[in-house]
Amino acid sequence: MGEEVKPEAKEAASAPQAVPAEEEEKKKDVAEEKKVAAEEEKPKEEEEPQPPPPPPPFILYVDLHCVGCAKKIERSILKIRGVEEVVMDMNENQVTIKGVLDPQAVCNKIKKKTKRMAKVLSPLPAAEGEPLPPIITSQVSGGLTTVELSVNMHCQACADQLKKKILKMRGVQTTVTEHTTGKVIVTGTMDAEKLVDYVYRRTKKQARIVPQPDPEPEAPAAAQEEKKEESGEGNEKPPETGEEKEEEKKKEGEENGEEGGGEEAAATEEERRDNEMTAMAQEEGMKRMMYYYQPSYVIERIPPPQLFSDENPNACCIS
């Protein structure tokens, strides 16, 4: 009876061996879960969004008259928050700004602080709303006229300012200015004399109308037909023989000898007069280009007094 082992004791002896096996399986499951979580976290870290690239610099058009204006505008722009760098181009009246800010807001601040016209050249703002209808110019009975003026302009800024003033005149459609030649071409329905007065009132610059050459009159078709008939295209004469040609030449020579060459003499006289006129015009032009020196200062050299001169002992006497 004492040798038999109870089944309850056997179960109690096998229980401690089963517990460690379950713990090992749990540990393995936890380790696998950690590996999977680590593998999932790695691509998330790699896929983190990169910072956006800085915006490209934008270009503004501003009226720059001189170096003082440019420095004043540059200082006012650098005070705006977000501006990193400012580059001024006085030849083209352009300002390049680098920074994170709205170009239109910068334009408005420049207009408010400096009282100068400014607009965005690049990048252009997106169009809002529906596109504007095309402008239809009214048909005037007088029609368009082109007037060429001669105005003294010192620099490109003067030319731009003059163009802006002329475009505000009623009836002006297009204006082209060239400061190198002082030429201004205006197209529109305005009066030329009123345009000259307007330019002087607005800019205090003297303008002069350049006269245009008259167009060459076209020969009518009837005159061309008469010339053809006179040349003998319609009525062709029979060919002349050699003897007849010689006789005609002799007759022409005798007539020219009797008349004394009137037509040729008149032609040579006109050429001589033209040559004299051109020579006189050239001489007058050379006189204008000559430099006349100022008259020299004349010094009158008075002879020395002869009162106490050794050369003339009779100049003085003591009585």
From Swiss-Prot:
Gene Ontology molecular function terms on file: metal ion binding
Residues covered by region (Disordered): 1-57, 207-282
Residue ranges listed under propeptide: 317-319
Residues that bear Cysteine methyl ester: C316
Annotated binding of a metal cation 2, by residue: C155, C158
Annotated residues for binding of a metal cation 1: C66, C69
Domain HMA: start-end pairs: 55-118, 144-208
Compositional bias segments (type: Acidic residues): 255-268
Coiled-coil region(s): 21-48
Classification via SUPFAM superfamilies: HMA, heavy metal-associated domain (SSF55008)
Alphabetically ordered keywords of this record: Coiled coil, Lipoprotein, Metal-binding, Methylation, Prenylation, Repeat
Domain of life: Eukaryota
Keyword Repeat: yes
Record field: compositional bias (Basic and acidic residues): 1-11, 24-45, 224-254
A Pfam family it matches: HMA
Residue positions bearing lipid (S-farnesyl cysteine): C316
Similarity comment: family membership: Belongs to the HIPP family.
Name assigned to this protein: Heavy metal-associated isoprenylated plant protein 9
The species this protein was found in: Arabidopsis thaliana
Gene name tied to this protein: HIPP09
